[in-house]
């Protein structure tokens, strides 16, 4: 039995095991099981990717990186997590207490919800919605609320400035990000992530939509606050931005959400442009993970290669370059589809 068979058989097994129970009980049980799997995936990825990024940055800067705990420093992230668990939970004087407390939880919830529509392999989609891409974009946009709450609730000018930067940056770059995805949707004729992957059986959309992929990558880098667009927490200017006053596990939730979002935007890029789980010989889930980690490596490589840019240059580049290019890509895609229909089907 393959991993795909196990994944797709979970729902059938639970329905048989809970035969006679109300439908909502079965649905709830399946949802809880999928949630546990997604949370385990997020936590394991965060531990591994933090270590990987530190090693990659060390290699690019001719350093060694973590090498003390475990073989080649593999347990360094575990030690950091244990350290954060033991940190004192501090709430600043004058802070808006409940806003300050709730913000880290609110940013982690949408970061988890994004994985509901990610096709991890053939038949391995937790919730294969017919509006999957729209769901992903809608849920991802809510993270700005939590970051703004964190900056406001801390009663710190640097935190508030960082959160305001975040809102300006993420709201601006959501537009070309969405427009870059529209070209793929036009080609696939569906918003369902599994159908978009299936439509790339003959050719990956990165070959048909290279400009859209570049726009998506740049906009996604800004959306997840990765360098060179990490102005939300520019250390030299505003310390840690909206995370300045957070300690312990509250800070860890922000950090965990950052890597969860990095994996999710990489997974969406693989789904939309790189053929998703499709590939020869290897299992579908393994192909998907390989492509996702290649995308993550590219994000990390960009972070440690390019310098941080100014906020005015960041926003100007979005409105004057990315947005017109994304609109032009939609126009060219639409014309190309019509020409293809005319040549192959004989109709306009």
Curated annotation (Swiss-Prot):
<dbReference type="InterPro" id="IPR018086">
    <property type="entry name" value="NADH_UbQ_OxRdtase_su1_CS"/>
</dbReference>
<keyword id="KW-1003">Cell membrane</keyword>
<feature type="transmembrane region" description="Helical">
    <location>
        <begin position="24"/>
        <end position="44"/>
    </location>
</feature>
<dbReference type="GO" id="GO:0005886">
    <property type="term" value="C:plasma membrane"/>
</dbReference>
<dbReference type="GO" id="GO:0016655">
    <property type="term" value="F:oxidoreductase activity, acting on NAD(P)H, quinone or similar compound as acceptor"/>
</dbReference>
<protein>
    <recommendedName>
        <fullName>NADH-quinone oxidoreductase subunit H</fullName>
        <ecNumber>7.1.1.-</ecNumber>
    </recommendedName>
</protein>
<feature type="transmembrane region" description="Helical">
    <location>
        <begin position="282"/>
        <end position="302"/>
    </location>
</feature>
<keyword id="KW-0830">Ubiquinone</keyword>
<keyword id="KW-0520">NAD</keyword>
<dbReference type="GO" id="GO:0009060">
    <property type="term" value="P:aerobic respiration"/>
</dbReference>
<keyword id="KW-0472">Membrane</keyword>
<feature type="transmembrane region" description="Helical">
    <location>
        <begin position="171"/>
        <end position="191"/>
    </location>
</feature>
<dbReference type="GO" id="GO:0048038">
    <property type="term" value="F:quinone binding"/>
</dbReference>
<dbReference type="GO" id="GO:0003954">
    <property type="term" value="F:NADH dehydrogenase activity"/>
</dbReference>
<comment type="function">
    <text>NDH-1 shuttles electrons from NADH, via FMN and iron-sulfur (Fe-S) centers, to quinones in the respiratory chain. The immediate electron acceptor for the enzyme in this species is believed to be ubiquinone. Couples the redox reaction to proton translocation (for every two electrons transferred, four hydrogen ions are translocated across the cytoplasmic membrane), and thus conserves the redox energy in a proton gradient. This subunit may bind ubiquinone.</text>
</comment>
<keyword id="KW-1278">Translocase</keyword>
<keyword id="KW-0874">Quinone</keyword>
<feature type="transmembrane region" description="Helical">
    <location>
        <begin position="253"/>
        <end position="273"/>
    </location>
</feature>
<keyword id="KW-1133">Transmembrane helix</keyword>
<keyword id="KW-0812">Transmembrane</keyword>
<dbReference type="InterPro" id="IPR001694">
    <property type="entry name" value="NADH_UbQ_OxRdtase_su1/FPO"/>
</dbReference>
<feature type="transmembrane region" description="Helical">
    <location>
        <begin position="317"/>
        <end position="337"/>
    </location>
</feature>
<feature type="transmembrane region" description="Helical">
    <location>
        <begin position="131"/>
        <end position="151"/>
    </location>
</feature>
<feature type="transmembrane region" description="Helical">
    <location>
        <begin position="1"/>
        <end position="21"/>
    </location>
</feature>
<comment type="similarity">
    <text>Belongs to the complex I subunit 1 family.</text>
</comment>
<comment type="subunit">
    <text>NDH-1 is composed of 14 different subunits. Subunits NuoA, H, J, K, L, M, N constitute the membrane sector of the complex.</text>
</comment>
<dbReference type="Pfam" id="PF00146">
    <property type="entry name" value="NADHdh"/>
</dbReference>
<feature type="transmembrane region" description="Helical">
    <location>
        <begin position="98"/>
        <end position="118"/>
    </location>
</feature>
<feature type="transmembrane region" description="Helical">
    <location>
        <begin position="203"/>
        <end position="223"/>
    </location>
</feature>
């Amino acid at each position: 039995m393959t991993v795909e068979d196990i994944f797709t058989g979970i729902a059938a097994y639970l329905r048989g095991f809970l035969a006679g129970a109300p439908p909502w009980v079965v649905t709830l049980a399946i949802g809880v099981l999928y949630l546990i799997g997604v949370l385990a995936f997020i936590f394991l990825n965060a531990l591994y990717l933090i270590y990987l990024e530190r090693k990659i940055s060390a290699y690019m800067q001719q350093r060694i990186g973590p090498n003390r705990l475990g073989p080649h420093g593999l347990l360094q992230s575990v030690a950091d997590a244990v350290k954060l668990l033991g940190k004192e939970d501090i709430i600043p004087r004058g802070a808006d207490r409940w806003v300050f407390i709730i913000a880290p939880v609110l940013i982690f919830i949408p970061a988890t919800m994004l994985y509901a529509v990610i096709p991890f392999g053939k038949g391995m989609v937790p919730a294969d919605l017919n509006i999957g891409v729209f769901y992903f974009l809608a849920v991802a946009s809510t993270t700005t609320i939590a970051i703004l709450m964190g900056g406001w609730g801390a009663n710190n000018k640097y935190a508030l400035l960082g959160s305001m930067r975040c809102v300006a940056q993420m709201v601006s770059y959501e537009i070309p990000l969405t427009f870059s995805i529209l070209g793929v949707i036009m080609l696939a004729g569906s918003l369902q992530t599994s159908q978009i992957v299936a439509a790339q059986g003959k050719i990956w959309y990165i070959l048909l939509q290279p400009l859209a992929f570049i726009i998506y990558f740049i906009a996604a880098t800004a959306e997840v606050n990765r360098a060179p667009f990490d102005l939300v927490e520019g250390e030299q200017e505003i310390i840690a931005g909206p995370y300045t006053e957070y300690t312990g596990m509250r800070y860890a939730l922000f950090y965990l959400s950052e890597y969860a979002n990095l994996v999710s935007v990489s997974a969406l890029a693989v789904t939309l442009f790189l053929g998703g789980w499709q590939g020869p010989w290897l299992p579908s889930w393994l192909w998907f993970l390989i492509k996702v980690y290649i995308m993550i490596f590219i994000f990390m490589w960009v972070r440690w290669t390019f310098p941080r840019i100014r906020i005015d240059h960041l926003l100007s580049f979005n409105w004057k370059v990315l947005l017109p290019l994304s609109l032009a890509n939609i126009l060219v895609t639409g014309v190309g589809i019509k020409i293809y229909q005319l040549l192959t089907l004989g109709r306009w």
